[in-house]
């Protein structure tokens, strides 16, 4: 899926990641690779999947050596097979080897997110439900992981605690109930702020609907119970299914008629896609 990633501020993040990895110096590369030598490396997939993170890989190599020639063969969103060539990097051999791990870490992780998202999004494609992520992201990586979700064909839930309200069970307990929580949220929020509330049963649905929730999250309900709730809500609020959604249950959830299906596993426990880098002949100065 075609989407865009803002690289604003990414240079600082990449420098921090490189500092974490390199420390005072890449002692293995410094010891084994002659200074001034050059090479050409090929980055390629070893498993089928959806590509994400090419621009980040380029930024990693350019942070180490701006003169490196990074040529992207594929763009983010490309469907890869087990032999797809993603990019080539030419130039200083020490810089290429030093940047290998970080660039691959980013490509593997983000492509893993995009691939898993694509797999689930394809399952519910015949239905109206939209697949979205959650805030269950890796600290410091949220905007990148949420970008990868978009690349894979999903959409983003709220970006953080600041752009939408989601009243969960603990908020409801502290506030004194569903109606009280929604009343307080509505009094606090601006007119542009959407308010979502989590409910666990039909009584909660009816109370949330009467109290004016914009979005009602059906938490850990069976598909049959979700379908009953959808009928009661009757388009008066957006309906989200959440909690325990898996590859085995997502189609049933979509068939229930919900508008949105949120899956934390898109980001919190995704398997990295196998991507590798092969070094060509080393040419000494």
Please name every model-derived segment.
Residues 271-283:
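Structured adenosyl-cofactor binding patch, chiefly the S-adenosyl-L-methionine
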Residues 235-238, 281-285:
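Short acidic, glycine/proline-enriched helix-loop-strand junctions
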